[in-house]
Regions:
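Hydrophobic alpha-helical transmembrane segments of membrane proteins
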Residues: 1-85, 102-245
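Short helix-to-coil transition segments within interhelical loops
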Residues: 91-97
């Protein structure tokens, strides 16, 4: 089991490294802006400081999304690993289908948990730079993002056990994203006509629109993460047993 997990890390190490680099660049960009607001050129312009403060609080979760979704948003390595045909020889060893699938799910769970810890540390530093305390609200938001990453990754893993080509998974994932975007636009755009200057107050207005459902986002994401983890595991076991390499 340990060998399978180590193999998964070797196969996907390039993607982990790229996601961490993008997170570091994004977080460093936010930190440099904050330093300039405190003791740099921007600090001499109160209006610019006020505008940037509001903007940074809107995009404060961007580095978290970069590292979590970066760790979860790939499938090429798993397809290359499965399509290499090595698993057919596992039938001549003591490895079971449950162990093979479990190694995929466990290795990705460990990596996403590591990304989650990094995001919490970043958020603590970000809040301290603004003189704010880390609260349960911030933790639940990052946890919701972590659950979303779990859903994406385990959904892709489950499809990888059935599909022979990565284009199939990409087509399904993009189709679901487009349907969700269409539903979101159908909800937002008719209501935007009521605004006199939508570009100026768009972010604040969108926050107000989603205020009634904000309390349900975390429990719903947590529930779906559990469903995709448990259900995806057993479905993946069946898919790998029926897979012809």
């Amino acid at each position: 089991m340990k060998g399978l997990i180590y193999k998964n890390y070797l196969v996907t190490r390039k993607y982990y490294f790229m996601a961490f680099v993008f997170f570091f660049i994004t977080a460093l960009f936010m930190i440099l802006i904050r330093l300039s607001m405190i003791c740099g050129n921007i600090s001499h312009d109160p209006e610019a400081v006020s505008d940037l403060t509001r903007t940074m609080w809107v995009f404060r979760y961007m580095p978290c999304a970069v590292v979590i979704l970066g760790f979860a948003g790939y499938s090429e390595a798993f397809f290359a690993d499965l399509n290499s045909g090595w698993a057919r020889f596992s039938r001549t060893t003591s490895l079971s289908t449950h162990q093979i699938v479990g190694s995929y799910f466990l290795s990705e769970g460990i990596v996403l948990s590591f990304a989650y810890i990094i995001c919490l540390l970043y958020l603590v530093i970000f809040c301290l730079s603004f003189g704010d305390k880390i609260s349960l609200h911030y933790i639940t938001n990052v946890t919701s993002l972590f659950c979303f990453g779990v859903i994406i990754q385990y959904f892709n893993l489950t499809l990888a056990m059935f599909a022979k080509k990565i284009q199939t998974v990409q087509l399904i994932s993009v189709s679901i994203a487009l349907i969700f975007q269409w539903l979101l636009c159908a909800y937002i755009y008719p209501r935007m006509e009521e605004l006199e200057n939508p570009d100026a107050v768009l972010l604040e207005w969108m926050a107000q629109q989603f205020e009634p459902i904000k309390a349900y986002i975390f429990p719903v994401m947590l529930l779906f993460a559990v469903i995709f983890t448990v259900g995806g595991y057993f479905i993946s076991v069946k898919g790998l047993e029926r897979r012809t390499f």
